Amino acid sequence: MKQSKISRRSFLLGLGAVSAAAVLTACGGSSSASTATAASGSSVVYRTLDQIKESGTINIGVFSDKNPFGYVDENGEYQGYDVYFARRLGEDLGVEINFVSTEAANRIEYLQTGKVDLILANFTVTDERAEEVDFALPYMNVALGVVSPDSNVIKSLDNWNSKDQMIVISGTTAETYLTENYPDIPLQKYDSYATAKNALENGNGVAWANDNTEVIAFALQNKGYTVGISELGNKDTIAPAVSKGNDTLLDWVNEEIKSLGDEQFFHKDYEETLVDTYGKDYEEDLVVEGGAVQ
């Protein structure tokens, strides 16, 4: 492992009710849907908790290429920290889960258009996002980090060479943070974790900025890379998200997170899905139990 090199501590269009009903029916949901309006003015479509129960299926958006948080294994099964949590939610709700592969840039869109009922995809809570979706209680801590090849370890973003490009994923907090705080750093934007990872490996950018959990995992899993900046900007939290105004589902998820805290569920989740990547050293830094940030 390379832990010694890593500091301890990565068309929002609204649809009408008729279109929403078609989407929800196709996903196995109720033909009846509720609507609300987000801060952007977009019409938001969602299924209430009772409608989800009645349908027998909940549609949950997760990543399919972001090991160890959400990915598809060699058997075609979804796995990871977020997926482990999702399966427990489905079990306790008494419904089947329809996993919907999502990218960072379409998490809000998928909620607003009713394609998913819930997002569990390393979704960092921000004020801007909270105007468009409703976040439940958090279940993980996170900050931003920067990973680069061992031959050019990036330890500071000050005095950045304007010819060098930073790799980011569109729709992430890393993109927003760098745009607002380091506008002179050229950003090379990709739509997915996999394409950003490939870009770094192919030398298309000098470094990759993302959630520190993700860049640390990348460096631990890939020889020749170092996380030179393990905490960039503010410390934030990861939380589930539902469509704006879907209070019945939001309240249920919040109560579930509180209840799961009593059994230290997210520590068990960490042990099952993250310990092989991070070891024990990061567990208390990352895990949030019962929605209570220490």
Predicted segments — roles?
Residues 29, 173-190, 227-229, 257-294:
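Ligand-binding clefts/hinges and TM-proximal coupling segments of bilobed small-molecule sensing domains
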Residues 27-36:
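Bacterial lipoprotein signal-peptidase II cleavage site
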Residues 37, 148-165:
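Flexible hinge/capping segments at coil-to-helix
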Residues 41-122:
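Extracytoplasmic small-molecule ligand-binding "clamshell" domains
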Residues 141-148, 216-257, 276-294:
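Periplasmic-binding protein-like
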Residues 98-109, 170, 188-198, 202:
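Short helix-initiation/N-cap motifs at beta->coil->alpha
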Residues 109, 123-131, 180, 201-202, ...:
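A ligand-binding cleft/hinge motif common to bilobed small-molecule-binding domains
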Residues 1-6, 13-26:
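N-terminal secretory signal peptides
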